[in-house]
Amino acid sequence: MSQNSLRLVEENSVDKTKALDAALSQIERAFGKGSIMRLGKNAPVIEIETVPTGSLSLDIALGVGGLPKGRIVEIYGPESSGKTTLALHTIAEAQKKGGICAFVDAEHALDPVYARKLGVDLENLLISQPDTGEQALEITDTLVRSGAIDVLVVDSVAALTPRAEIEGEMGDSLPGLQARLMSQALRKLTASISRSNCMVIFINQIRMKIGVMFGSPETTTGGNALKFYASVRLDIRRIGSIKERDEVVGNQTRVKVVKNKLAPPFKQVEFDIMYGAGVSKTGELVDLGVKAGVVEKSGAWFSYNSQRLGQGRENAKQYLKDNPEVAREIETTLRQNAGLIAEQFLEDGGPEDDAGDAAEM
């Protein structure tokens, strides 16, 4: 009885293998070679290429060393919180690696002088200032499908105005129009983005939901589609000012990884954004170095490998700016211990502050 049962299973498995092979060959004949494959036989597919964000602590918090290529990323936050700055830093890092980048400026507010200061190569940056939301997303789709773009930024979702709204009267009520536009565009874009290995960053604004009694009243514009399609969502906030004497020279910024499909989410980091200079890399090296024990702090003095960096944080930052080889050494050590730093020293912000679980009407 057991022999018959065993023979039956063997015959059944052979039949299943033959049936599967026939199905695979039929799919490949209908849709082309590579339309279906065994994942284990194509190991490079698993490797996820990333682009640094310009912030060492954020790269570590993301768990994979930066923002992922071939995925959709959403950066949202209040006004003047550093959303465009973070996107421009990512473009600059991609260009350093030889990548081609594009910027769809729906807000018509890109400052080329500031972008150059952040390290963006303006001569090789493609820029579009579309008239309507449909035009912006059509340009995005065409650039992505070309397969030549490495990073594409759309600034911002809130400024993607549907054609019907532009052609209508000022007081016309057109509920859900922008949400439908985004939903349709993302359905088209997702497969192209993955195939072309292009990272698309959507910058988004915050609105307030009316009549919310419990939970956060904040929501992002453009409906719910972007929340689902995005592999990474970053919530960026200004939490304070940096002063030199009485003059404000920068912002203290907090970024929370609200969603991450590639590593554990909810990591939270803080760094400085200096006016006219962007993310303060030396400030991050000092702060992360102290947390990880790479940089020693004794009273107000900072030192590295028994070498004094300076008295006070600002003096230590200036020393690293004047001695880039020491800064590179500290950065290399921190990147090598990224996993330990992310696990032990970066704050876990928790899932409670997820802006916009409900679509804006």
Swiss-Prot record:
GO terms for biological process: DNA recombination; DNA repair; SOS response. It is found in: Cytoplasm. The keyword Ion transport does not apply. GO terms for molecular function: ATP binding; ATP hydrolysis activity; ATP-dependent DNA damage sensor activity; damaged DNA binding; single-stranded DNA binding. Belongs to the RecA family. Can catalyze the hydrolysis of ATP in the presence of single-stranded DNA, the ATP-dependent uptake of single-stranded DNA by duplex DNA, and the ATP-dependent hybridization of homologous single-stranded DNAs. It interacts with LexA causing its activation and leading to its autocatalytic cleavage. This is Protein RecA. The gene is recA.
